């Protein structure tokens, strides 16, 4: 089962926490849809900013959104002008008071979501899939990853029949719950169809008492 389950969902409550942190009873469905709408909007709006993760915290009439990005300067803008514009756009989607917290991803080479998006972007630019995979694997290991696995599925290289190719280096223990494994998924929209890119990065084991 470790092969099929989402590595982040599998570790929730053990070494990972939820990306949406709030509690609701009657309004649960409404707030869940609102979260999805906010995430989709931010992903589309900040497409070129290298957004890795979006966390949403809610309390009464306030919503705090933490955006983890590789390029915080693009989101913040000159003297914070871009952030203010973004806040106003988000306020139209929800009736809550919005607080934005922009956090920098120091090593984008070790962030599975950013790596998968980078590989997908290269595939869209017609870079050979093996070269794109190998390049990302090499740079992740260079920046201190203990192991990495990249999987590409679809009509690779414009082949008639779709297939799955993967490349792994180092250790990627999928069953070990204390293993800190980051997971990312992206889609490359090529002229032949969509190619799915999955990335698993093993950063080491989280021992009891550590965060």
Curated annotation (Swiss-Prot):
Q: Residue ranges of the KH type-2 domain? A: 38-106
Keyword terms of this UniProt record = Ribonucleoprotein, Ribosomal protein, RNA-binding, rRNA-binding
Keyword field contains Nucleus? no
Gene3D superfamilies membership:
3.30.300.20, Ribosomal protein S3, C-terminal domain
GO terms for MF: mRNA binding; rRNA binding; structural constituent of ribosome
**What are the GO BP annotations of this UniProt entry?**
translation
What Gene Ontology terms describe where this protein resides (cellular component)? cytosolic small ribosomal subunit
PANTHER family xref list: 30S/40S RIBOSOMAL PROTEIN S3 (PTHR11760), SMALL RIBOSOMAL SUBUNIT PROTEIN US3C (PTHR11760:SF19)
Q: Share what the entry says about its subunit structure, partners included.
A: Part of the 30S ribosomal subunit. Forms a tight complex with proteins S10 and S14.
| Reported function | Binds the lower part of the 30S subunit head. Binds mRNA in the 70S ribosome, positioning it for translation.
The protein here is known as Small ribosomal subunit protein uS3
**What organism does the record attribute this protein to?**
Geobacter metallireducens (strain ATCC 53774 / DSM 7210 / GS-15)
